[in-house]
Each structure stands twice: as structure tokens, then as C-alpha cells.
Curated annotation (Swiss-Prot):
Transit peptide, residues from-to: 1-57
Statement: the UniProt record of this protein carries the keyword Plastid: yes
Record keywords: Calvin cycle, Carbon dioxide fixation, Chloroplast, Photorespiration, Photosynthesis, Plastid, Transit peptide
Gene designation per UniProt: RBCS
GO terms of biological process kind: photorespiration; reductive pentose-phosphate cycle
UniProt record similarity statement: Belongs to the RuBisCO small chain family.
Location in or out of the cell: Plastid, Chloroplast
Subunit structure: Heterohexadecamer of 8 large and 8 small subunits.
Organism domain of life: Eukaryota
SUPFAM superfamilies in the record: RuBisCO, small subunit
Protein's name in the database: Ribulose bisphosphate carboxylase small subunit, chloroplastic
Species of the source: Musa acuminata
One Pfam entry name: RbcS
Coarse class of the protein's main subcellular location: plastid
Keyword match Nuclease: no
Length: 180
């Protein structure tokens, strides 16, 4: 049985194909940091940076205590009528459908239960129907004024709804009652 087994001690040699000869060896290990050129300047000289010629004036952030935050643009002061009309024009230019909502509290609240529900202030009451086909920002502003007269102690917000994507794209407070 041993005589029938033949063991070859000759080494086999295969010739490398052209595709194998141009292959790059895989990366193994980390290279030393001393091999990389130094890119940092040794001193902390800031004179090469551009300057506007004056001190930097930073805008103060909204206070975190005693002032409620609302929705988009809530960190800004209350909008004047001209700014409100410009926001509505942007909404209409974007081909969104304006919709007005109002709520007496304006915040999320829970009275009878700790878990979230329908009556916890997340859902506001719609003022009339969405303004399908509206192309005039002044018409939307008139609706805000009409809602103010009807509900002077309620928050009023304007929503821009995209009926193609079926999503609400913008929402901002148009009116806050006195004291907020």
C-alpha cells in the first residue's frame, strides 16, 4: 500500500498573469506619524485670518426661563404685519396651501392623564377650511385678522401644506395673545 502512494517533492511554479503583476499589496498596520509632513504652524498667530475690522457682536439666545417657545421663528420678536405678509408670500410661492389654526392655550398640556392623547394641545382647531387656490397673501392676513376678532385670547398659527407630498412644510405663530 505504501508503494502505491507517490509523494512529489518538486515545487510547482505558476507564472503570474499581467493582471496579478500590477496589483498593489494590501495595507497592513499603521504608518508612523513622523512619515507625514507637518501641516500645523508652530505658533498661534491669528493675524493671517480675515477680519471685518471690528469686534464680533453675538446675538443673545432666547431666555430659557419664563418665556415659552413656539414653532418656527419663535426665537425672533413678534412679527409685524409686513413681515407676516412676506412669510405668507413665501408660503404661496412655494405652492403650499395656507391653513389657519387656533388654540386657547398654545402649548402642549395634559389635564387628566400623563400619557399623550388627542386633547393634550398638540392638535389645534382649524379656522375654516384650508385656503385651496389662494394666491394672495393679503387674503390670508385678512383671515388672521378675522380669527383674532373672533378669538382674541387664542394663539393663531399659519400652516403651509404641500398637497403633492401630503406633508406640512411650514408652521409659524401669526398671533399671540397679550401677555405672551
Amino acid at each position: 500500500m505504501v508503494s502505491s502512494m507517490m509523494v512529489s517533492s518538486a515545487a510547482t511554479f505558476t507564472r503570474a498573469s499581467p493582471a496579478q503583476s500590477s496589483m498593489v499589496a494590501p495595507f497592513t498596520g499603521l504608518k508612523s506619524a513622523s512619515a507625514f509632513p507637518v501641516t500645523r504652524k508652530p505658533n498661534a498667530d491669528l493675524s493671517h485670518l480675515p477680519s471685518n475690522g471690528g469686534r464680533v457682536q453675538c446675538m443673545k439666545v432666547w431666555p430659557i426661563e419664563g418665556v415659552k417657545k413656539f414653532e418656527t421663528l419663535s426665537y425672533l420678536p413678534t412679527m409685524k404685519d409686513e413681515a407676516l405678509v412676506k412669510q405668507i408670500e413665501y408660503l404661496l410661492r412655494s405652492k403650499w396651501i395656507p391653513c389657519l389654526e387656533f388654540c386657547p392655550k398654545g402649548f402642549v398640556w395634559r389635564e387628566n392623564h400623563r400619557s399623550p392623547g388627542y386633547y393634550d394641545g398638540r392638535y389645534w382647531t382649524m379656522w375654516k377650511l384650508p385656503m385651496f387656490g389662494c394666491t394672495d397673501a393679503v387674503q390670508v392676513a385678512k383671515e388672521v385678522e378675522e380669527c383674532k376678532k373672533e378669538y382674541p385670547h387664542a394663539f393663531i398659527r399659519i400652516i403651509g401644506f404641500d398637497n403633492n407630498r401630503q406633508v406640512q412644510c411650514i408652521s409659524f405663530i401669526a398671533y399671540k395673545p397679550t401677555g405672551y
